[in-house]
Design a protein with these regions (language model features):
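Alpha/beta enzyme core
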Residues: 1-161, 165-177
Length: 177
């Protein structure tokens, strides 16, 4: 089972809005909200997002779920079924009651997390990745800045990363191409 577990965006955004409201109530004019995302390495979610219409934030979040399409006759007692764009789908649910994301969706989820956090009250975004990869980080920053050109972004320069080894590997990979 994957280690990191996310929650739907609306749950996280409610916390950002609560902090912003607390600043207003307390008269704090220079408070800074830092949103942190390390969803890139998360493969599971705690719950399915509430969605009201196609394309809303909940729908976008649920589109990352690992699902199987099924017919009504194939439904089992206790199944969780989603009507996704007119099709019935069953998200992959683990015995722990967590839901699994599709492989390869981490970067898209992280970019969506980042953009929605900044659009909903975060002043600064702290991005984490599973390893220091310049191309990956740069690509994510560019995608965020396409939507929010003045986004204030910081990166987790973790000493737990073996920076030298990772950069050597990236140079080697570039030479091999």
């Amino acid at each position: 089972q994957d280690g990191k577990v996310t929650v739907p965006h609306e749950d996280f955004l409610a916390k950002i809005r609560a902090v912003r409201y607390a600043f207003l109530e307390l008269g704090i004019e220079d408070g800074v909200i830092v949103a942190r995302t390390d969803s890139l390495g998360a493969g599971l979610t705690k719950q399915i997002a509430v969605t009201h219409e196609v394309g809303d934030l909940g729908d976008q979040y649920n589109s990352f779920l690992d699902v199987e399409e099924l017919e009504p006759a194939d439904m089992n007692h206790g199944d969780v079924i989603i009507n996704h764009h007119g099709k019935l789908v069953r998200p992959k649910r683990l015995p722990s009651n967590l839901y699994q994301f599709r492989k390869g969706t981490g970067e898209d989820r992280c970019v969506l997390d980042s953009i929605t956090s900044l659009q909903n009250g975060a002043d600064l975004l702290w991005i984490e990745t599973e390893k220091p990869h310049i191309g990956q980080i740069g690509g994510m920053v560019n995608r965020i800045r396409e939507v929010i050109p003045n986004a204030k972004l910081v990166y987790n320069n973790s000493p737990s990363f073996n920076w030298t080894l990772n950069f050597r590997q990236q140079v080697f990979d570039a030479w091999s191409e």
